[in-house]
Amino acid sequence: MTMADKRRRVLLKLSGEAFGGGQLGVNPDIVSGIAREIAQAATDVEIAIVVGGGNFFRGAELSQRGMDRGRADYMGMLGTVMNSLALQDFLEQAGAETRVQSAIEMIQVAEPYIPLRAERHLEKGRIVIFGAGAGLPYFSTDTVAAQRALEIIADVVLVAKNGVDGMYDDDPRTNPDARKIDQISHQEALKQNLKAVDSTALSLCMDNGMPMRIFGMEPAGNVTAALLGAEIGTLLG
């Protein structure tokens, strides 16, 4: 394959909360819609996905209620596997060939996480979903998205946000005067302590020259557009 033939390779980060539509568990209508948008771009783009687990468990929040942080994080990781399997099913219904790789071994439902195998799947046109976070406590799925993107040599990390359409200088949900940022460096985002993604993920991308685009999942069509390279939301790089 020549450089001219090389397809764009992206790492898409999806929030778990989006899968539940604000409720506990998985909303089939929402996940089906997300899957159709991803499948539309899969013929032109190599797509890997990291899914959060916030619609089931959030380790940091459970630990604040007295639960051991490590155990709470492992519960969150298992939630991401459930989301990964749900997304796999709806992607395959939409006609996309898909593989799930889990950082925690569970061979009945997913392949183990093997970066070179993931790259081969991508080259063959399969969508790869990474479940179980990093397989280690204290790592957010934002950080895992950055790490996986670097390891599979993605061109960009795309962070799909629920309820916000990019990075702002303050929380637009509480401050109506918050200003949307079209482009900013990783370093400046860290310096300003902007909260759209976690600081460890930003640092990883900054240190390794990985661009990141933060965009809103709505309206319909945004996920497909971002995967295909549309300049929506906020570019960090």
Swiss-Prot record:
Chemical reaction(s) catalysed: UMP + ATP = UDP + ADP
Keyword terms: ATP-binding, Cytoplasm, Kinase, Nucleotide-binding, Pyrimidine biosynthesis, Transferase
GO-annotated biological processes: 'de novo' CTP biosynthetic process; UDP biosynthetic process
SUPFAM superfamilies registered for this protein in UniProt: Carbamate kinase-like
One Gene Ontology term of the molecular function aspect: ATP binding
Quaternary data: Homohexamer.
Name assigned to this protein: Uridylate kinase
Species in which this protein is naturally found: Leifsonia xyli subsp. xyli (strain CTCB07)
Gene: pyrH
